[in-house]
């Protein structure tokens, strides 16, 4: 009989209803839900009661560090003093399991994960549980951000055999690494409706001793089934599906799950999911004259505005938290992830391009201000995340959200100044509290605070418009804006004195690539050269610290060392598909923002390496990992869902299209078509699970615009034309600067550039689309009209 328990923390954006995708979101909130274990298994398990204790009493507490002390990962180092005899993922652990004929206990998480902290504190620091693990299992700890391939393979098993997934992910493997039982967070002891970790360990231990052959057979059967289920191949298909059909179906599925009042999609917990917003903007552009097109734009803009006004946004320190635990975007899970900041900075810039509303550009600037201040290494790289938990005061146990919460008393003490010109007696603190919904009792529903840690605390969330707040107190809008900004700055300065949340100072190539895109796109759209410079510094960091010149390969990780140094793991952790895809995207965005062709050259080189390491020459599309790197794993998978991060295959499809437009090389287009064809069945089945790939499908079937500007890169007229292009939302384009040098890199790639001439010695634009060329344009206003058509 299987273990039955309440639902697990949801994995990677799992949504109930409305046909929305289970993407790559992280586990949901610790508040308002029973965060019990989820157990999946491929074999019968004994029912009821605790298993018999088959081992001698545990030894005296172990004070020395385990072998994880030699690792670089912040997550592994957090477990380096556990009594558990942890191994990192590797041959030493596998050999030990085979030699001693023991199952492997694999635990996967990441350093800013609330429930990973909980399980470590409750179970992995427990001497008796540590002894139980050491005697009966080979225990392996993995940082999912270092080894996304390991995470994806075993999460596929957990999701397929249980009601969901999340982190920490705990899976039991045969010595040959095939999974047979899996789950998420386990409490240490049995409860009324849930099975404790100690009991699960003893049951599995008994089963391994009594029914090992059955375990092995069932494990092999499940692995075979997962392999067949995860197959993605061109098969006998010749072409990808119709973009018009996939667009329409994807939009309809999103429309069905849309929250009319608060924006967003499906039920709480609500995630930002920028890939969905990107799709809606693209859908609007190609359906502007239709009701559905207007609806798509409204859905995206309303969602972005509600998110920015909600508690999911840090109004004091800027940036966005991981997700909202309620449909109102009010109470967040307070973790902050680099990849969210990167993608949201881009989508808020797109909202500004489309609407012209500076509200959206201000949000984008705030995100990038936060990243610059909190997540940036001085050499140009970007850190991974900040934890949700921090001590309310020094020496106290960390609590979720402690850094971000406020009491009325605190705000009154910080902002006691009277507001001049108000229609009634009013302090700056009272104005801020009214605008952001603070109350004496706190504005957090007790059902969202199951541990009672947030009583009397408040999350800042915009309750009224500036106009309404001003009207309530007889103040001008600009006066209200200034008073609120001053108040928020004082709160920010006060917050500096609180204990900081843990910073995961691991730097990942993939997420750094996304952040290069964020700074490059924002810099070009907003006309802020300093942001383009930060993107450039990020790309230089990648090339200096995360690129192996001799092999041309990317390294997955590096780490912040003492004194601002950068440290590498030894041996290096080599890049995965997402590292190449996201870095290539970042370099292409940086090329368009800076017009420095060296970034395009590097992008082409990385794309070549990506094709050699990850391309499936038989079935089409890209595998997540290199063939050699994943030889130990039972599955070699292809990333097939756009979630918190876009699928690397979706991003690669866009990259291939752009590279074809920038070089004219037919191979890139052929690969793109093959990739889209391989994913045909996935798109047809649930297009809303791949909105970024549906966008790529549309771009491939509609063809890209080639916008060529002939001019001196430093001349004012050239810059005016470039800024005109950057200010308009044109997702399916490539932007090329032809400086007239026939020996330049781009002229060698696209010989026709040498034939283009400036008109009357002025910077001139030519637009190529559907094998046709526009008349030459020199006037930015005329160019704007043409691009808006």
UniProtKB/Swiss-Prot annotation:
Tell me which InterPro entries the record gives: 6-hairpin_glycosidase_sf, 6hp_glycosidase-like_sf, Ssp411, Ssp411-like_TRX, Thioredoxin-like_sf
Its primary localisation, in coarse terms, equals secreted
Question: What tissue specificity does the UniProt entry give?
Answer: Testis-specific and age-dependent (at protein level). Highly expressed. Expressed in round spermatids located in the inner half-layer of the seminiferous epithelium as well as in early elongated spermatids having cytoplasmic protrusions into the tubular lumen.
Instruction: Spell out the coiled coil positions from the record.
Output: none
Keywords attached to this Swiss-Prot or TrEMBL record, sorted alphabetically, are:
Developmental protein, Differentiation, Phosphoprotein, Secreted, Spermatogenesis
Q: Which cysteines are joined by disulfide bonds?
A: none
- The answer to whether keyword Transport applies is no
* Pfam families in UniProt: Thioredox_DsbH (PF03190)
Swiss-Prot/TrEMBL GO biological process terms: carbohydrate metabolic process; cell differentiation; spermatogenesis
Region feature Disordered, mapped onto this chain: 1-65
Cellular location of this protein? Answer: Secreted
Instruction: Write down the superkingdom of origin.
Output: Eukaryota
Q: Any idea which residues bear Phosphoserine here?
A: 5, 652
Q: Where is the composition biased (Basic residues)?
A: 1-19
This entry carries the following GO cellular component terms, namely: extracellular region
Describe the task this protein carries out. Answer: May play a role in fertility regulation.
PANTHER family assigned = SPERMATOGENESIS-ASSOCIATED PROTEIN 20
Q: Could you tell me what this protein is called? A: Spermatogenesis-associated protein 20
Per the UniProt record, the source organism is: Rattus norvegicus (Rat)
- GN (gene name): Spata20
